[in-house]
Regions:
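Conserved phosphate/anionic-ligand binding catalytic regions in large, soluble enzymes, centered on
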Residues: 68-82, 194-198, 248, 257, ...
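Active-site glycine-rich loop that binds ribose-phosphate moieties when present
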Residues: 52-54, 269-270, 307-319, 324, ...
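Intein/HINT protein-splicing elements and their conserved insertion hotspots or analogous self-processing inserts
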Residues: 2-104, 113-186, 194, 203
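Hydrophobic alpha-helical bundle architecture
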Residues: 68, 94-104, 111-113, 220, ...
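A generic local secondary-structure boundary/capping motif
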Residues: 3-7, 27-31, 98-99, 176-179, ...
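C-terminal and late-domain segments of enzyme folds
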Residues: 328, 333-449
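N-terminal beta1-alpha1 cap of cysteine-dependent amidohydrolase-like domains
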Residues: 134-288, 292-303, 308, 317-325, ...
Length: 449
């Protein structure tokens, strides 16, 4: 790799990547799981001893005796401390001879469900929410706060906004239905330069029973763009739904996200056939993350049609925290008016991955009240109590009224920030929650009923 940027030169560099695939049943998480378990060190002073320790650890893991593990970098103290954070299970050291603060690259600390004799036992998990190393002890809460504070000034994790806001609920079950049924509805997935969620989106739609097709938008030359417009307009004529996936279309430039997508959909031919899909053929549209940004800029949410926007329209802007956020959040269903949410109930809580720098929903109070009354506020970010919140730990972008997703007036166009397509077996095993809100299955059923 080499190159330059302005006055900065990058010397020729070799970068190596390595992966170690394993069966999903062998996957371990780092959080301590239960009180009364022995905690062991698998390490060696020579390469041969280290390899033997790894083999012994692997054998125990495959036998189901390892319930959590940590690859040591900066010492045993760091390992047991961070292992304790997830479930606030304490640790008491039993081996004080070890150097708890010396780097130990290659070593593994593991929580075992059974006793073993061929590894070094270093301690035991405890009910007390503290880490005890001999006579020294500190609470997990204190240690976690100190750990978070190290880079808080550089990479803040909190903002001043906190507390609850109104949790909207709209109980109507009235939904639109298509005049023509489809056993296997076709879903068109436009892929723009910078889109990066098309494969997850296609997989989710296909598994739900849709005929999901990616459409690559080419923009290398003006002729490529014209050809893409013509072919996309033709493809829309035979589609039942359009799903705009997430990513960073056009690198989120110039000056904001989704402008490339917006310009493409405002083309007269594309606009005509998208309008026909929605207004004449009862079709559906979904925009996730970057796709949601495009739907808002086009007016498709909350107004249900492509239109010229002005300063009174809602928008999605930069996260309050001032940086990109990537994490799992909880969302609360506020309305089931949309066919996309037919598999949910008002008040249901779903955990969803988010990854964006511009996800803060802003709208006037008057518009929000109108959307709430119409049942167009589909989902809100929620805290552990199940209610909407402005706390940055749960509302990652500072969206007004904690709004995560909204719909068109009839619910057939849905935009949301959370990546509901990024779910599947063996994912997020260390974060409890309900992940599948049946978004794509509900869309397919809409055309079958």
């Amino acid at each position: 790799m080499s190159g330059s940027f302005l006055d900065r030169d990058v010397p020729p560099t070799l970068i190596s990547f390595a992966i170690a695939p394993l069966l999903e049943g062998e996957l371990l998480t780092t959080d301590l799981k239960a009180v009364g378990h022995g905690v062991y060190l698998f390490a060696g002073k020579t390469p041969e001893q280290q390899a033997a320790a790894w083999e012994r650890f692997t054998a125990l893991a495959r036998a189901g005796k390892v319930v959590s593990a940590w690859a040591v970098e900066n010492g045993l103290a760091e390992a047991v401390m961070k292992m304790s954070f997830g479930n606030e299970i304490g640790f008491a050291a039993e081996n004080t001879v070890l150097d708890w603060f010396a780097p130990m690259p290659g070593a593994i600390v593991a929580e075992l469900s059974d006793e073993v004799s061929d590894a070094v036992r270093i301690g035991i998990t405890t009910a007390e929410k503290a880490i005890a190393l001999g006579a020294d002890s500190a609470s997990i809460e204190e240690l976690a706060a100190l750990n978070d504070a190290v880079l808080e000034a550089v990479y803040p994790t909190k903002t001043r906004d906190s507390g609850t806001v109104e949790s909207f609920s709209h109980e109507t079950k009235a939904r639109v239905a298509p005049a023509v049924k489809q056993a296997r509805p076709k879903a068109l997935i436009p892929v723009f330069p910078g889109t990066n969620c098309e494969y997850d989106t296609q997989r989710a739609l296909s598994e739900a029973g849709a005929d999901a097709e990616q459409f690559i938008v080419r923009n290398l030359t003006s002729a490529d763009v014209a050809d893409s417009v013509e072919r996309f307009a033709a493809a829309v004529r035979t589609a039942q739904m359009i799903v705009i996936p997430g990513g960073f279309s056009g690198g989120d430039e110039p000056d904001g996200s989704a402008k490339l997508i917006t310009a493409f959909f405002r083309n007269a031919a594309v606009r005509e056939h998208v309008t026909a899909l929605l207004e004449q053929r009862d079709g559906l549209m979904l925009g996730i993350c970057n796709g949601f940004q495009a739907l808002i800029k086009l007016g498709l949410v909350p107004y249900g049609r492509i239109m010229d926007t002005d300063e009174s329209f809602p928008t999605l802007t930069y996260n309050v925290i001032g940086r990109h956020q990537s994490k799992l959040v909880r969302t609360r269903v506020c309305s089931t008016r949309s066919p996309w949410l037919a598999g949910t109930e008002v008040g249901d809580i779903y955990t969803v991955p988010i990854s964006h720098g511009e996800g803060r929903f802003l709208a006037s109070r008057e518009l929000i009240e109108q959307l709430a009354a119409n049942g167009q506020i589909a989902t809100q970010y929620a805290g552990l109590d199940g209610y909407a919140t402005m706390d940055t730990a749960f509302n990652p972008n500072g969206s007004v009224c904690a709004i995560e997703g909204i719909t068109s007036p009839d619910g057939r166009v849905f935009g949301k920030m959370g990546h509901s397509e990024r779910i599947g077996p063996a994912l997020y095993r260390n974060v409890p929650g309900t992940y599948d809100m049946h978004l794509f299955a509900s869309a397919v059923r809409y055309f079958k009923k």
